[in-house]
Structures are given as C-alpha cells and as structure tokens.
C-alpha cells in the first residue's frame, strides 16, 4: 500500500512540476491575492481592444485567458482577472513597477526589450506596413508626405530607418491611439499610417468603412509578437510557455486564429504555419 501511495505521489509531482516546490514570484503573489493583473491595449484590434460590451477582447486576450486557466489549475483556486489598460509608452514600466503581471497585446519581442522585461514563446508573426485612403493612391512614394505612427513602438523605429535609408524626406507624426490615426487619415491630417499589418487590418475593420482604406502589401519590418512578463520569473514564464506550446501541439491555436483573423484572412501566412511547427515544443 505504501508503495502504491509513493508511486502516485511521484506521478502527481511530474504532472505538475511546480507543485513539487514552493511557489515564487508572480505565482506566489497571485496565490495570496487571488488576482492576476492583465495589461492590455484598448485600441489594437484584432490583438487586444474593447468589445461592444466594453470588455477587453482579442487574439492575445484569448491567449492570456488560457494562461489564467492554467494558473488556476496549478494553484487550485479561482483567480480573478483584473484588466489594466496600458499604452505603448508605459506598458513595460507597468510590468517593472509591478502594476501588471502579464502584458497581452501586440508586443514585439526584441533583444533590447529583453533587458527590461521577459517574453514568452512567440504568439504571432507580422510586419509593419502602411494604410492610407484609397483616394490618395499612395504606392510607396512618401516624399513630402505626413506619416502617422504610434510613439514608442518598434514600427516607429523601423519607419525612421526606412526613410533615412531611402533618403526620403517625410514628416513623421506621432498619434496617441489608433482611433486618432483613423480620424487623422479621414481628415487628411496625415497621408498614411504605419503599424503592424495585422493591426492595420483590424483598424480598417472597426472603422465602419473598411473599403475606404488601402493597405500596402509590402512589409518593411519583421515583427515577432509575444506576451510579456517580469524578468527573473522563470516559474511564471514556464506556465505561460507550457500553455502556448500546448495550443500549438494540439492545434487549438487554429480556433483562436480563425475567431480573430478568419473573417479577412483567406489563408494563413506560411510564417504563421511555420510558427505552429516550431513552437509545438514537447512536454
């Protein structure tokens, strides 16, 4: 009988490695508060934005919900999700200052950003492009044009490099939100807006008149997206990575993808299909 109990204990420990030792970092904090604070962008469709009922929705929000369910399973308690709106400028500071526990939006994973925050496995792959009114007929000719972009983003950095390398003289106009960008485009205050192509598609869809816009097919950057969390928190990162890997292995990620991209993506990109294969890491 003792032998059977010992074997059962070993099996339980392997099925949930984190239960085999004391909780640390964010997991310990969540166990005490029974709450996880999720940072999200309010105007980054289809990755994260406010739905018609005023609640956060989107591709990244769904991924974070899967992480929360895994945390509840590990802790054995119900965990409340508290959504905290963040901006492009303060999202990483919010993690550093312990105001949020997990950043769920359209965040590009870079080496330099890894100096201040940590990242999960990749959750999406996209690239920066331009959106303009169809009537402007912009075709990669931005000489003397006004180009809007969100400050503090990798797109802003890539845009500055693109214009410098091409020796194009254009005015960069920083906008606070995607809604402001749409208004600026419609009023003619800017000639084009630069952002991740997937974000541009989402913006067009919620504008109310998507056929008025043209999104250039060419990309001028590589944007690997991931969820972000605090540095030096290996246990919490392991939980998130385990969830993401399982979504890829089980192909459940395809259901989430179709929910948010199926209406305008006739077929998945080869880069995303490759991402599924590469991130389906064995348990």
Task: Kindly give the residue locations of the regions a language model identified.
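Short beta-strand-to-loop elements that line the ligand-binding cleft
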Residues: 75-87, 168-178, 184
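Ligand-binding clefts/hinges and TM-proximal coupling segments of bilobed small-molecule sensing domains
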Residues: 21-22, 157-175, 211-213, 244-283
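A ligand-binding cleft/hinge motif common to bilobed small-molecule-binding domains
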Residues: 90, 104-115, 158-163, 186-221
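Periplasmic-binding protein-like
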Residues: 42, 124-132, 197, 204-245, ...
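Acidic, polar ligand-binding/catalytic clefts
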Residues: 65, 76-142, 214-217, 280-283
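Extended ligand-binding regions for polar small-molecule ligands
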Residues: 21, 27, 58-70, 136, ...
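Extracytoplasmic small-molecule ligand-binding "clamshell" domains
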Residues: 21-104
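Bilobed "Venus flytrap"/periplasmic-binding protein-like clamshell domains
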Residues: 40-46, 56-73, 107-108, 126-179, ...
């Amino acid at each position: 009988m003792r032998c059977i109990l010992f074997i059962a204990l070993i099996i339980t420990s392997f099925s949930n490695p984190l239960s085999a030792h004391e909780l640390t970092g964010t997991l310990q904090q969540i166990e005490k508060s029974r709450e996880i604070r999720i940072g999200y962008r309010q105007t980054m469709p289809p990755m994260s934005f406010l739905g018609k009922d005023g609640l956060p929705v989107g591709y990244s929000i769904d991924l974070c919900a899967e992480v929360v369910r895994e945390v509840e399973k590990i802790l054995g308690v119900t965990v409340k999700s508290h959504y905290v709106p963040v901006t492009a400028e303060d999202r990483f500071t919010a993690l550093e200052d312990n105001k949020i526990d997990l950043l769920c939006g359209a965040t590009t994973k870079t080496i330099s950003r890894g100096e201040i925050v940590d990242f999960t496995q990749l959750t999406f792959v996209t690239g920066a492009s331009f959106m303009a009114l169809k009537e402007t007929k912009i075709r990669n000719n931005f000489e003397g044009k006004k180009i809007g972009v969100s400050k503090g983003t990798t797109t802003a950095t890539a845009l500055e490099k693109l214009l410098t390398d091409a020796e194009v003289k254009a005015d960069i106009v920083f906008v606070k939100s995607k809604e402001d960008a749409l208004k600026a485009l419609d009023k003619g205050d800017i000639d084009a807006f630069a952002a991740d192509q997937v974000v541009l598609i989402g913006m067009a869809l919620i504008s109310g008149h998507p056929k008025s816009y043209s999104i250039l097919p060419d990309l001028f950057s590589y944007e690997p997206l991931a969820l972000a969390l605090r540095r030096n928190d290996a246990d919490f990162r392991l939980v998130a990575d385990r969830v993401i890997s399982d979504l890829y292995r089980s192909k459940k990620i395809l259901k989430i993808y179709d929910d948010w991209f199926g209406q305008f993506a006739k077929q998945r990109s080869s880069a995303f299909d490759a991402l599924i294969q590469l991130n389906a890491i064995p348990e």
